[in-house]
Amino acid sequence: MRLAVQLAELTGASTSTAATQGPMSFPQRHPLCGPGASATYDYVLGLEAPAAQVSLTGPALSTLLARDTAKIGFGGIAPGVSRPGRGRGRGDAPGGRVIEVDAEASLPVLIEEVRRQMTSDRQRAIQDRAGKHAIANQQARLEALNKALEQKRAGWNATPIATARIYAELWPLIMNEDWILASPSGFSGGHNGQLWDHDKPYSYLGSQGAGGMGYGAPASVGAALAAKSRGQIAINIQCDGDLNYAPGVLWTATHHQLPILTVMHNNRAWHQELMFVEYMCGVRGRGGDRGHIGTTLRDPFIDYRMMAATYGMAGEGPITDPAKLGAALKRGVASVKRGQPYLIDVITQPR
C-alpha cells in the first residue's frame, strides 16, 4: 500500500480501490481516491487488476485470468474479473496489454523513473491536478455519505433491528482501533462500504467464494488468531444460519482468548434461500405459505447467547430493542479490547 500511495502522490493520479470488496492496496479515504476532477485520462495503469490500458499482473494471476473462459472469477482468487468498476480500466477503458511482473516488486522501479523525469514545471502541474482531484473526491465522498445516511435513517428505530444500525453504531466504537472486518458483509447489507473507512490492506477480508455457507465464523476466528499478536481486534457480523455449520470455532476463540467481537445478524432464517423459495412459489402459482419449510430457523428459535456460553464465551441477547443496541456493542468492544471474545445476539431485519 505504501508504494502505491507514493506513486499516486508523485504523479497526482486519480485512483480507484477495491477496499470495500476485500483486501486491497490503496486506502479508500485517500484524497486521490475517487472519481477525480476529470474522467479524461492519458494513461490507465492497473496493479494486479485486469483490463487497464497496461496491467502489471503476476504470472500466477495472469494464468488464471487467461483460463477464465466462463468468467467465473475463481471464487474471488482473481479480483475484478466480473465486478463492476474493477473488470475494466478507469473511465471504462478497454482492455490493453498485460505485463507479467509482480506489481508490488515493480513499484520501486516506476517510482524511481518518475522521479528521474520530474521537472519543476511538471511538479507544479501535478500539484495542481492533485489538488483538484482532492477537492472533487471530498465532495463526492460527502455526497455519497449523506445519501447513504438518508437511506439508512428510514429504518433506524425499526424492530427487528436494521442491519445498517449495527454497522452505524459499531463504527464510532472501533474507528480509532486497529480493526479487521473478518466476516463477509454482503448478506448483512454491506453497510461497511458506505459507513466505515477502509484504509488498511486488511480492513475488510472479503466474501466467501460462491456464497458458500459456514464460512463466516471460522474465517473470523482465523483472522482473530492472527490479530491477537498484532494488537488488533477482529469484527464478525455473523449470519445466524451460517454459524450453525461450524459453531465449535466459538470454543477455539474462547480457548485461545482471541480478540473477536461477534454480532449476530439473526434473522432466524437462511433468508437468501427463503426469498428465493417465496419468489419461485409466486412464479409457479403455488402460494408462499410453505416457503418457510427448510429455510427458517424456528420452532424453536436458537438462543445464540446460550450457544456461546456453552463454549465458554461471554455474551448477551437476544436484543430486540434498537435503543439497547449501542450499549451492548460498547460492552462487547470493551471485552474484546481486554482480550476476551464476546458475542451479541441481535434480532435483525431479513437483510
Predicted regions and their residues:
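Alpha-helical segments flanking ligand/cofactor-binding loops in enzyme cores
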Residues: V5-Q6, G36, A168, W251
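Thiamine diphosphate
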Residues: S38, L107-P108, H191-P350
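Active-site diphosphate/adenylate-binding microenvironment
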Residues: A136-A227
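Redox- and metal-dependent alpha/beta enzyme cores, enriched for Fe-S-associated oxidoreductases
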Residues: M1-S16
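Short acidic, glycine/serine/threonine-rich loops at helix termini
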Residues: M1-L3, F26-H30, S55-P59, S82-G87, ...
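Glycine-rich, acidic loop regions that bind phosphate or pyrophosphate groups
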Residues: A18-A134
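Short glycine-rich anion-binding loops that position phosphate/pyrophosphate groups of nucleotides
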Residues: T20-Q21, A49-Q53, I77, G186-S188, ...
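General beta-strand structural signal in soluble alpha/beta enzymes
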Residues: T15-A18, G46-L47, I99-V101, I180-S185, ...
